[in-house]
Amino acid sequence: LESYVALFDAAAALTGEPGIALQYGEAVRMQEVSIVGLICEACERTADVGVELNRYAALVVDEDRGEPATLMRGAWQDGNVWIEMPDNALTRDFRMVEAEFARLVWNGRVMFANEPAFRAIRYPGEIHFRHPDPGYRTEYERVFQAPVVFESHWNAMQVDPEFLTLKQPPVNRYVFGILSERADALLKALQATTTTHGRVESALIPVLPRVDVGTDDAAA
């Protein structure tokens, strides 16, 4: 993630556009950069997207822990439905936060551009950021087309409850299964290199045919 942020810094300096992270999130769909995005695109309902996103969070956020992170979660506050980005590696730099919220918003707008039920609601209704105004509020307003609140107590966006009932454009369920199977394999491989148990197993696998030793023996 440090390299990701450094790229935003370099791009902003070279282009003279401080809001380039917002523009990146607006223009580049998650399915263009990650298998997790393809899985989310293949979900049947919008309500399923958060489940799959958090399931494969370790493939999106490199926290070097091999543990699942919560990238997005639903919340109910003051009678409204919100999608919150809780504290995780993505929230350590405000450019990551603005890029991912811009991506989330525009993924929805592009996906449901021809859906009457989506066009009938406001998406998002409002959006909150914990960081202060970085100096380009008008770009935030252009990208999100909704009221923007800085220095809030959370990073979150308000959505119409109807949004969570929308069915996504149909995708072959076989494709969804293949993508999930591949992502599970990638997740397992990642965990094998980031957890203590996985590192021990990886070290022992080359000698297992020659030496009768198991992970329990190694731990002892």
Can you say where each PLM-predicted feature lies in the sequence?
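N-terminal low-complexity or simple alpha-helical regulatory segments
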Residues: 1-80, 84
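Extended mid-to-C-terminal alpha-helical interaction segments
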Residues: 134-220
